[in-house]
């Protein structure tokens, strides 16, 4: 009788559930996974090397394109690393704006993750709900930076500009008549803070809608409970962070453990799972969105009461205002030097990490005193998570591999860098 052999198949990189360009080589015994071998590098763009040929500020837009669903969080880590090298103090208003946009980014990321994770498993409706709210938050991105995704809004020393006092309006067209446009513009009559205030009042109700669709849905639970279990010991050994480690019961969150910006001044809780499976990680992300909503509300209240500068007044780092340049030759020279040569960062090295929606996103920057980085190392959270794919998916059915990829929330921009 012929011997029974395992067979090997390719999962991706063209598979719709591969979340980009993931290629998994799966060794299967029937439908049970014996081995999963992730192949990475299909989206490698050499970001770390490219940064060595650009000035410090010119590399900010590269950061947006790493994890391209959590844009401003990437910029934040990079700007913090530069600020540590420079020893620059960020104005308090800029810190609150950064924290507010970090949390907007967290909600954007989790909405995309929960929507597409459900879509992968077969719950088609969820993604339609989550993209409805993403649209509002993308408008907040667009209001401050002009771009819906790659904002390049943070700068070493603060943010590019203060929050706008009016929101862009929808105009009637052949797809939307005047009545529809009037409803869409109802929340856009005031400033960006008014728009976000309106959103944060509505958002908890939307979260309840998502929970109605998924949390007690028995098919969703059958597909996620007990799937992709990670013990606390394994999570620590594999270097997990974010919802992947919190889902396993370890309350590790850089916003609480190593507070940066004004996270020690805002009130929020860290959701923690019990069983370390896909379902617990989903619940963690759901609760994180509610906590982010709380933080945004606190930031809105503070920003309304406290006007002030949004970028450092050190003109070796940040450009002077137009008014100053018109009357002062010194400021004009600063401006010219900044935008031709760039700032010179003192010799040294610094590591800055933020609590990114996916985990700990770190930037290790080495300066040799020049106007560009000597070396830039990016610590992507998804890299450690994907590395454990083989261990986590072993013994599961091939359909469960899709659920595990969804719960890891992998984005190849940051993994391949």
UniProtKB/Swiss-Prot annotation:
Matching NCBIfam families = NuoD, PRK06075.1
Bilayer topology annotation = Peripheral membrane protein
Q: Which EC main class describes this enzyme?
A: translocase
> Where is this chain's protein located in or outside the cell?
Cell inner membrane
Which gene codes for it? nuoD
Q: Which UniProt keywords apply?
A: Cell inner membrane, Cell membrane, Membrane, NAD, Quinone, Translocase, Transport, Ubiquinone
Task: Describe the subunit structure.
Answer: NDH-1 is composed of 14 different subunits. Subunits NuoB, C, D, E, F, and G constitute the peripheral sector of the complex.
UniProt cross-references to InterPro entries, sorted A to Z: NADH_Q_OxRdtase_suD, NADH_UbQ_OxRdtase_49kDa_CS, NDH1_su_D/H, NiFe-Hase_large
EC number(s) recorded for this UniProt protein: 7.1.1.-
Tell me what reaction this enzyme catalyses: a quinone + NADH + 5 H(+)(in) = a quinol + NAD(+) + 4 H(+)(out)
Q: What does this protein do?
A: NDH-1 shuttles electrons from NADH, via FMN and iron-sulfur (Fe-S) centers, to quinones in the respiratory chain. The immediate electron acceptor for the enzyme in this species is believed to be ubiquinone. Couples the redox reaction to proton translocation (for every two electrons transferred, four hydrogen ions are translocated across the cytoplasmic membrane), and thus conserves the redox energy in a proton gradient.
Can the keyword Amino-acid biosynthesis be found in this entry's annotation? no
Say which species the protein is native to. Answer: Azoarcus sp. (strain BH72)
**Looking at the record's lineage, which domain of life comes first?**
Bacteria
Would you tell me the Gene Ontology cellular component terms?
plasma membrane
Reply yes or no: does the keyword Repeat apply. Answer: no
Which family is this sequence assigned to? Belongs to the complex I 49 kDa subunit family.
- Protein name, entry field: NADH-quinone oxidoreductase subunit D
Mention any Pfam family matching this sequence: Complex1_49kDa
Q: Which GO terms describe its molecular function?
A: NAD binding; NADH:ubiquinone reductase (non-electrogenic) activity; quinone binding
């Amino acid at each position: 009788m012929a011997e029974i052999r395992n067979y090997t198949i390719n999962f991706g990189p063209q598979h719709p559930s591969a979340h980009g360009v993931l290629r998994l080589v799966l060794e299967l015994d029937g439908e049970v996974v014996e081995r999963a071998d992730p192949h990475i590098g299909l989206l490698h763009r050499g970001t770390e090397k490219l940064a060595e040929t650009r000035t410090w500020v010119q590399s900010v837009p590269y950061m947006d394109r790493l994890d391209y669903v959590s844009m401003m969080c990437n910029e934040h880590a990079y700007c913090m690393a530069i600020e540590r090298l420079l020893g620059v103090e960020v104005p308090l208003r800029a810190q609150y704006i950064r924290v507010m946009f970090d949390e907007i980014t967290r909600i954007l990321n989790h909405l995309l993750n929960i929507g597409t994770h459900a879509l992968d498993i077969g719950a088609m409706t969820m993604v339609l709900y989550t993209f409805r709210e993403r649209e509002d938050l993308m408008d907040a991105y667009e209001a401050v930076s002009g771009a819906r995704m790659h904002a390049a809004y943070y700068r070493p020393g603060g943010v590019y500009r203060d929050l706008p006092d009016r929101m862009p309006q929808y105009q009637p067209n052949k797809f939307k008549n005047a009545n529809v446009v009037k409803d869409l513009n109802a929340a856009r009559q005031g400033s960006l803070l008014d728009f976000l205030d309106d959103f944060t009042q509505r958002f908890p109700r939307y979260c309840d809608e998502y929970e109605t669709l998924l949390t007690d849905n028995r098919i969703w639970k059958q597909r996620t409970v007990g799937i992709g279990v990670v013990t606390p010991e394994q999570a620590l050994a594999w270097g997990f962070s974010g919802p992947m480690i919190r889902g396993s019961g370890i309350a590790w969150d850089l916003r609480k453990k190593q507070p940066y910006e004004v996270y020690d001044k805002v009130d929020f809780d860290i959701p923690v799972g019990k069983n370390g499976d896909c379902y617990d990680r989903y619940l963690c992300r759901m609760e994180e969105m509610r906590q982010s909503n709380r933080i945004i509300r606190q930031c809105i209240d503070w920003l309304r009461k406290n006007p002030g500068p949004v970028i450092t007044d050190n003109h070796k780092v940040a450009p002077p205002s137009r008014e100053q340049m018109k009357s002062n030759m010194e400021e004009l020279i600063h401006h010219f030097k900044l935008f031709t040569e760039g700032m010179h960062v003192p010799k040294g090295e610094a590591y800055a990490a933020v609590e990114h929606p996916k985990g700990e996103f770190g930037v290790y920057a080495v300066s040799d005193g020049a106007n560009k980085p000597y070396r830039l190392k990016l610590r992507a959270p998804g890299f450690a998570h994907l590395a454990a794919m083989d261990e986590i998916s072993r013994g599961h059915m091939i359909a469960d591999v899709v659920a595990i990829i969804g719960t890891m929330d992998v984005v190849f921009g940051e993994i391949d860098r």
